[in-house]
Amino acid sequence: MLLLPIGLFGCGAKKKYAAADVSVISFSCSSMSYTDSYVYSLKKENEEWLFDADYSYDYENPRVEFENKKVSAQDAAAILDVVKEQGLILQAQKYKSPRIKAFVLDGGGYFLYFKMNDGTEINAEIYNEDLVNELRTLAEKCRKS
């Protein structure tokens, strides 16, 4: 008798994903300051990794924007290693939006998004400095190439 109510209320675990299941990862920061806002996106298409970025690399130079830059499997693996080491997929799955949306005029808003190989989308308003640093490193590498 007790098994029936447990099953009805969804006590089943969420599907566990690994970094290898990621087909798209995107991280962005929105800010009142244009130079502090950025968007990075890494996606796998036809067994190739493509990288998009829109950011400022310093306060004196214009924005850098590029789309669909081919990056090596090693560069993609460095990003996915951070995802794995920091447990970012599980963090994003566990994320719950705040009930009260507080609005801070100059507060940065961070957004992490995953699309998995099976089409599942996972997103959360969380920040991870290691991920940002790795994405920024890849963006700079692409900018200079």
Stretches found by the model and what they are:
Residues 39-43, 65-73, 119-130:
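Short amphipathic beta-strand/extended segments with alternating polar/hydrophobic composition
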Residues 1-9:
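Sec-dependent bacterial lipoprotein signal peptides
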Residues 34-45, 72-75, 94-104:
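Phosphate-binding glycine-rich loops and adjacent basic patches that engage nucleotide phosphates
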Residues 54-91:
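A short-motif feature that recognizes glycine-rich, charge-decorated loops
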Residues 11-62, 66:
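N-terminal export/targeting and maturation segments
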Residues 47-50, 74-80, 129-142:
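Short, surface-exposed linear segments at secondary-structure transitions and domain or protein termini
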Residues 11-32, 93-145:
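Short, well-ordered, aromatic-rich surface patches in folded extracellular/luminal domains
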